[in-house]
Amino acid sequence: MSDKIKPSEVSEVLQQQLQEVNGSQQFDEVGTVLTVSDGVARIYGLRNAEANELLEFENGTMAIVMNLEEDNVGCVLLGPTAGIKEGQSVKRTHRIASIRVNDNFLGRVVNPLGQAIDGLGDIDLTGAFEMPLDRKAPGVIYRQPVKEPLQTGLKAVDSMIPIGRGQRELIIGDRQTGKTAIAVDTIIVSATAADPAAMQYYAPFAGAAIGEYFRDRGYSALVVYDDLSKQAVAYREVSLILRRPSGREAYPGDVFYLHSRLLERAARINDQQEVAEQMNDLPECLKGKVKGGGSLTALPIIETQAGDVSAYIPTNVISITDGQIFLETDLFNQGFRPAINVGISVSRVGGSAQIKSMKKVAGTLKIDMAQYRELEAFSKFSSDMDAVTAMTLDRGRKNDQLLVQPQYRPMPVGEQVAILYCGVHGLMHDVPMDKVRDCQDQFLDAMRSQHADVIETLADGKLTDDCIAVIKDTMANVAGQYKA
């Protein structure tokens, strides 16, 4: 028997078996849950955990590190607390909180983790970029001035409070005044009131990260934060549970920094490719793939209480943004929609974000409307007035009617210029007040069918003498039908 067994054969078999053994070992840094309550957990044992790092619990729930303390780590849960108990293990992922993004996100509804919640199935993440939720804003060198208009299709906004690409324009007002209706976009990062506070807190950051993915690849993106008041409340809730020091109205001391670092990420990137490629705090996945000239425009929304714009969070965001659109309950109830208070609404970018034809036509519209409001207030105390005052009031009331616009019915900029020219220059003075909107619709129908070339010229920014003559003739024909 011993003659049949050869040492060389035994060694070959042993070597073959040893080769099949996987000698590589994976070490995970694991901690233990000390306490869990109200969407916040404290973990013992993760000494090397980093701020904003993702942690994974036994049941697959993810969490983000927010507090680094002497003997434990405080983290916020990105899922339900059910199933998480004291003594369970938690491991580090060695990944800073991020979201995987690609072009397949267009037209989808996702949560702050990038998971689809619109019932249309999972999103194909082939070739996705890992975009950090929290990222430093581009430095001044990598930006360029806001000079390209972002057409909203709303006459009141495009004419008097123009928004440019790369701008941050606040939409502020009480509940139910039409704030969301002004700004609606396609990719929605949703965290509802029923979601954990951490999901509500991180939803705007996820939206900014998706916007930056498109901006840094040379596209123009728009992000709408609806609304930052709720995010501040969610941040306050999380911070108080983590026992962070509280300040005014029990908000944490860094609530201003929370909103400023989020909104400063909106920018128009420098057109020069070599400059854009050197952008600060660029994620690894974007290095070598950045294209200049992209923009990220932010429209944050803030809900006020009884029109109080001097409260803590509203004043913070007003001071950060490049202007605000203030919506008033009284105007909304009177039927003026969008219910924009022209007097205290402003765009600090101004005419540089308007095409030339709109700038020429609407240059005095805001002042005219402010003077009309003042005159209207005084006219209530006086029965007789001179002809000039009566004409100013009539023109102002008709312009008010022209600026009213049905919900989700944007108007092309060429048509806006044409109808606003008629209003500003008093071409509708013979039209009865209750027929102004009918006259507007008939005028625009005539322009579309007979003078489409003029509308195109106006949209290109050219207000020529020929265009003005066509506008005057068309309005004269239409207005003549409404003479009393």
Model-derived features with residue positions:
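Phosphate-binding/switch loop-helix module in NTP-utilizing enzymes
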Residues: 160, 200-235, 286-288
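P-loop NTPase nucleotide-binding/switch module
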Residues: 88-90, 97, 101-104, 117-168, ...
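The conserved Walker
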Residues: 175
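N-terminal accessory targeting/assembly segments
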Residues: 1-108, 112-117
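Phosphate-interacting basic helix/loop segments used at nucleotide- and nucleic-acid interfaces
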Residues: 13-24, 153-157, 207, 262, ...
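Residue-level signature of catalytic and energy-coupling elements of molecular machines
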Residues: 33, 87, 109, 163, ...
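Active-site phosphate-binding and catalytic loops of NTP-dependent enzymes
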Residues: 18-27, 97-101, 116-123, 141-147, ...
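Conserved catalytic/coupling modules of large nucleotide/cofactor-utilizing molecular machines
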Residues: 213-216, 230, 237-484
